[in-house]
Amino acid sequence: MEEINKTPKQIVAALDNYVIGQNQAKKAVAIALRNRYRRMELSAEMQEEITPKNMLMIGPTGVGKTEIARRLAKIVHAPFVKVEATKFTEVGYVGRDVESMVRDLVDVAIEMEKQQAYSGVRAQAVQAADKRLVKLLVPAQKKQAKNNGNEFQNMMNMFSQMQNGQTPNVDDSSNEEVTDEVRNQRLSVADQLKTGRLENSEVTIEMDDPQQAAAGNNNMLGQMGIDLGDSLGALMPKKRIQRTMPVSEAREILVREESEKLVNNADIYHDAIVRAENTGIIFIDEIDKITKGGQQGSGEVSREGVQRDILPIVEGSQISTKYGPINTDHILFIASGAFAESKPSDLIAELQGRFPIRVELDDLSKDDFVKILTEPKNALIKQYIALIGTDNIKVTFTIEAIEAIATIAYKVNHETQNIGARRLHTILEKLLEELLYEGPDMEMGEVTITESYVNERIGNIAQDKDLSRYIL
C-alpha cells in the first residue's frame, strides 16, 4: 500500500529522471496510478464498482511509450508485463493465446512475492547455506548404509514436501562419520567463511537443473494454466546436476534453496495473485498492427479475431493459471502503437471503448535529443563514459559535440525512417567505434569528443542520404 501511495506530482518527478518530455503521457499514467490508491481507500463494495481507466498511447517508435510504462511499474513496485499484439493468434490457431499475457503477469508477481519472502528469512537461510558449504568444503566419510526401516518414511516425507511445492529437506548429517580431525577442520573453515577469506575458492555443489526448469515453463499445457511439471513433480523428483563454482556464487544458490524451505508457497501464490489483480500492469505494444488498416497478407490469421480475444480480458474476466484463478477486472492495461498506416478508430468499437484515455506522444526535437543524451539518471553519454572508463580512458564530451550529435540524429530521423531516441544508439556506436575497439591498447588517458571529432567521423555519412540510410 505504501508503495503506491504517491501523488501524481511525485510520480511525474520520478519519471522525469528517466524519460525526457512527454508531459501529457506522464500526467495520464500518474493519475491512473493515483486512482488505484484512491480505490483501495474506499469500502469493499465501492472498490468492486471502480475499474481502472485503460490507456492508449499513440506515437512513433522511440519516443518513450514503453519506457514510461516500464519505469512506472518500477516506481510503484507493480508486476509488469510487456507483450506484442502481433505475437498472438486467434483462438483455434497454433500460437500464443491472449490469456498467456495474464499468466505471465502472475509469474512476475510470484517472483516479486518470493523475493520479498526470501528477504525476510535471508539471515536464517545464509546460516543454513554456510553450514552446507562447510560440509561440502570438508566432506566426511559416509556411514555404511543400513536398512533400518526409515527409508520408506523418508521417501514419504520427501513426497509430501514436493507435493506442497517445497524443496525436499534432505539432511544427511546423520549418515556422516565425523572424526575429531574433520570437526576441527570444519570449525576452521566456518571461521574463514565468516571473514570472507574463501569467497573465491572453488566448491562443487548439487543443484536443480536449470534446463529442466526452463523446459517445464515452455510447454503448451503451461499456457493453458496446467503445469505438467508440478503435476508430475511429486512422482518424478527434480533432476539434480553437479557444478563447480566459486563459494560466493554457490552461497547464493544454496541460500535460495534454503529460503524455499523456510517460506510457505501457498501464501506466496495467494499474495501474488492478489498483487497482480490489484496492482498489475499489462503493456500491449503494436496494437495498431492488428487493426483493419494494418498491413495484412491474404494468408494471415485474422487480426480482428485477436482483437475480439483481447476484449474479454480487458473488460474483466477470470483466467485459469497453475497457481489459481485470477480476475482481470482491476488490472491496468496500457496499449500503444505508432498508428502510421492506420488510426485508433480502425480498432473494433468494443475495444476502443475499453481504452477511454488516449494520449498522443510528441515527436522528438533536437533539444529533446540533447536532453536525452545528458539529463536522465543513466543517460547514454554517461553509459559510454563508464564503459570506456573500464579501459582507464577518461572520455569527455563538449557541449558543441553533444549538440552536433543531436542535430545529426534529428536530421537522419527526418530524412530516412524516424526511430526516435533509438537513433542515438546507432550514432554513438559509430562515433565511438574506434575508441571501443582500440581502447584496451591505447596509452593516452584522456579523450575529448569535440564537434570536429563528431563531424569528422559521422558528418559525411549523415550528409549522404543513401549512406545514412544503411549506416546510421
Swiss-Prot record:
Nucleotide-binding listed as a keyword: yes
Q: Which UniProt keywords apply?
A: ATP-binding, Chaperone, Cytoplasm, Nucleotide-binding
Localization in the cell: Cytoplasm
The primary site where this protein sits is cytoplasm
Q: Which GO terms describe its molecular function?
A: ATP binding; ATP hydrolysis activity; peptidase activity; proteasome-activating activity
Question: Where on the tree of life does the source sit, at the highest rank?
Answer: Bacteria
Q: Which residues participate in ATP binding? A: 20, 62-67, 285, 350, 422
Question: Its quaternary structure?
Answer: A double ring-shaped homohexamer of HslV is capped on each side by a ring-shaped HslU homohexamer. The assembly of the HslU/HslV complex is dependent on binding of ATP.
Q: Return the protein name.
A: ATP-dependent protease ATPase subunit HslU
User: From what organism does this protein derive?
Assistant: Lactiplantibacillus plantarum (strain ATCC BAA-793 / NCIMB 8826 / WCFS1)
Lineage of origin: Bacteria, Bacillati, Bacillota, Bacilli, Lactobacillales
